[in-house]
Amino acid sequence: MEDEIRAFCQTAADCFIRLGDCAPAIAEAAGVVTASLRAGGKVMFCGNGGSAADAQHLAAELEGRYLKERAPLPGMALTTNTSTLTAVGNDYGFDHIFSRQVSAHGRPGDVLVALSTSGNSANVLKAIEAAREKGVSVIGLTGAGGGKMAEVCDLCIRVPSTQTPQIQQMHIAVGHLLCGLVEDALCS
């Protein structure tokens, strides 16, 4: 059992070392988010399962604080309103639970951060489509392959793993990096 624990930790450590290769894309994403917030835009987040939890976590880091005492920043998780999710899911289908919200709330200059370990989640892809129609910039967080999202995002950060647990660990790390870089830019 201890060997399994050590192997898990070593795999995670190796993934995080390789995540450094994503530094240019992460820095670019932080610039996009910072510019949007400076111009009065907002950041919307979406994803399924563990990615939904990450979406909520990262929106909370913006609305509350990450590391610095500052004014709240407009972050919005599209995963939280159960009435909207179930009404849209029932009336239009699960594939539209995020896209309807992007269509309702998205404005030119806003940012959608779309999370999918595979890059192929149908409802996330529909949200990206809606974002593009509204003039919303799209930052994708996926696994190494990128899936269909790699082709449709303005910027796709493909973390260096094909295993869901490691992808999710790195997604939250990327999110924390984004929050920290944005705070540094806006609070300096």
UniProtKB/Swiss-Prot annotation:
GO BP annotations, alphabetical order: carbohydrate metabolic process; D-glycero-D-manno-heptose 7-phosphate biosynthetic process
Catalytic activity: 2 D-sedoheptulose 7-phosphate = D-glycero-alpha-D-manno-heptose 7-phosphate + D-glycero-beta-D-manno-heptose 7-phosphate
Residues given in the record as Zn(2+) binding sites: H57, E61, Q168, H176
Cofactor binding note: Binds 1 zinc ion per subunit.
Cofactor(s) essential for the protein: Zn(2+)
Coiled-coil region(s): none
Keywords, ordered alphabetically: Carbohydrate metabolism, Cytoplasm, Isomerase, Metal-binding, Zinc
Note: The reaction produces a racemic mixture of D-glycero-alpha-D-manno-heptose 7-phosphate and D-glycero-beta-D-manno-heptose 7-phosphate.
Protein role: Catalyzes the isomerization of sedoheptulose 7-phosphate in D-glycero-D-manno-heptose 7-phosphate.
Identification of the protein by name: Phosphoheptose isomerase
Species annotation: Rhodospirillum rubrum (strain ATCC 11170 / ATH 1.1.1 / DSM 467 / LMG 4362 / NCIMB 8255 / S1)
Gene: gmhA
